[in-house]
Design a protein with these regions (language model features):
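Catalytic nucleophile serine of serine hydrolases
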Residues: 345
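Flexible phosphate-sensing "switch/lid" loops adjacent to ATP/NTP-binding sites
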Residues: 1-333, 340, 382, 391-497
Length: 497
């Protein structure tokens, strides 16, 4: 196939649709016979994923790699920032943690400058550029994604991910604007006007995203935008709700319906303050037997058939908050009255007798009593376990810190045995269990086990749900949607010019 330039999707702001458009083009290029790969130099997200070789990257790049039909790799997202508080993030470089950074130190004092880790000098800009170079030697084209807005001129000197990265990659840049939030003319024109003359030349096209209504009403707007900016509008993509791509940000979770439904098993996912890896529940949410909702309301929790405690980036902080807001007591009471409780990763730790952090890896709290639903104890340590796993129920992945063992003289009752012979999780009964395995709910065998105590509540049972096949269908639907409204031939011309 002909060698194409890298393409980079940048935005007028956050949540304009860069990640989804990048996934769409990963699938489009694959359908057209190319071997694309995604790349985002630096990502900030709690929703991460374990690569096949046991390292950690942002979930969006894992999704984009899946759309491209290739295994994910740390070179696709060499630098990941995982917020631990309002001001501090864990820095993941090439899939492994290298320490915590205060936001001011990272963005204002250091950013791309050299820092020291255990007497080793780290140059973040050099690291991400080298990762890109390795990736571009293997795949064609590279589908790059920027971060946030390209107009944050106060952070330009430390920017690793937007136009400075495009310059290194010699990428053709496409600016994405979100018309649904309003002000698209100002945001697109302003984003371009605030760039240096050198960087403005990199922007080869504009895509207007999330359009609602009659497309013909924007014909004049499209012409005016092209005249204002001197850059072609390559497409106007309508807003959609019928295509389901795993999301990286949890903005929409609280908007999902919480009302109980008759004829289905009602599953409450507890909305922790530091909830992470909420894509654990995407497959369960699509299961026709289930009505899944997110809540931290004690009344909602008390009415659920199944309560799931999800992963968290700050176990002790969320445990403290659960006790403060009454959710801990509501979960214990609901379980006593017949509800099932499942904990995943940090949620598994919460279900134990205690969580200890004697060396303060998470914060200032030394120890807190857990919910007492499982006879286990967890001690936080500095080692992060990151790997993909196989177990009796199927596949998944681990991303966690802390060691969990039976409490006192409690016997070991693992939920499953992993492919390397290690035991995972703890099970008291079919209505009380925990696991470290993210993605376990993607496996039909485990979902059947979880739902079995409430099978008599299901009024209509359809065909078995194949989540992997569903995801493939969604990538194809997304590609078809973008092909319909974006000038793909023009983009190929730009990338070949």
């Amino acid at each position: 196939m002909k060698q194409l330039h890298p393409v980079m999707f940048v935005g007028t702001g956050s949540d304009v649709g860069k990640s989804v458009l990048a996934a769409a083009f990963c699938r489009i290029f694959r359908q057209d016979g190319y071997q694309p790969a995604p790349f985002k130099a630096q990502n900030m997200a709690l929703n991460s994923y374990a690569t096949p070789d046991g390292f950690e990257i942002g979930r969006a790049q894992a999704v984009q790699a899946e759309a491209a039909g290739i295994p994910c790799h740390t070179d696709m997202n060499p630098l990941l920032l995982k917020p631990q508080s309002d001001h501090t993030s864990q820095v993941i470089l090439h899939g492994k943690p290298v320490g915590n950074k205060h936001a001011y130190d990272y963005w204002r004092r250091q950013g791309d400058k050299k820092t020291r880790r255990q007497d080793v000098t780290i140059d973040y800009r050099a690291e991400v550029c080298t990762a890109f170079d390795r990736l571009s030697a293997k795949y064609n084209p590279i589908v790059m994604e920027g971060a946030g807005s390209i107009s944050e001129i106060n952070l330009r000197d430390t920017d690793l991910v937007n136009l400075p990265m495009a310059r290194h990659a010699k990428a053709d840049v496409i600016l994405v604007g979100d018309i649904d939030r309003g002000g698209v003319f100002a945001s697109v024109y302003g984003s371009i006007a605030l760039q240096s003359p050198e960087d403005r030349k990199l922007i080869r096209g504009i895509i207007i995203n999330k359009f609602r209504g009659d497309m013909r009403l924007f014909d004049e707007g499209r012409r005016m935008l092209e005249e204002l900016c001197g850059i072609p509008v390559l497409g106007v993509v309508p807003y959609f709700k019928d295509i389901h791509i795993e999301e990286e940000d949890s903005v929409a979770l609280a908007q999902k319906s919480w009302q109980l439904m008759q004829g289905k098993i009602n599953v409450a996912v507890v909305m922790l303050q530091h909830l992470s890896n909420y894509t654990d529940f995407d497959a369960l949410e699509r299961d026709p037997r289930v009505h899944l909702f997110y809540t931290n309301n004690v009344d909602d929790i008390s009415k659920a058939d199944i309560i799931i405690l999800p992963g968290t980036k700050s176990t002790l902080s969320d445990l403290y908050e659960l006790r403060r807001n009454g959710c801990a007591q509501a979960i214990i009471k609901a379980h006593r009255e017949g509800a099932s409780v499942l904990g995943i990763c940090g949620g598994y730790q919460l279900m134990g007798m205690e969580v200890c952090d004697p060396h303060h890896f998470e914060g200032d709290i030394d120890r807190l009593p857990g919910l007492g639903l499982l006879p286990i104890t967890t001690t936080m340590n500095g080692e992060k376990r990151t790997r993909q796993v196989k177990c009796d129920y199927g596949t998944g992945y681990e991303i966690h810190m802390g060691e969990t063992i039976p409490f006192g003289d409690a016997p070991a009752k693992p939920l499953t045995i992993l492919d390397d012979g290690r035991s995972d999780g703890y099970v008291v009964s079919d209505k009380c269990m925990g696991t470290y395995i993210h993605g376990i709910l993607d496996n039909a065998a485990f979902v059947d086990k979880l739902l079995s105590p409430f099978a008599d509540k299901i009024e209509h049972v359809g065909a078995a749900f194949d989540y992997q096949a569903f995801k493939e269908q969604q990538y194809d639907k997304l590609a078809a949607h973008v092909r319909k409204y974006v000038d793909i031939d023009k983009i190929y011309h730009i990338l070949s010019d």
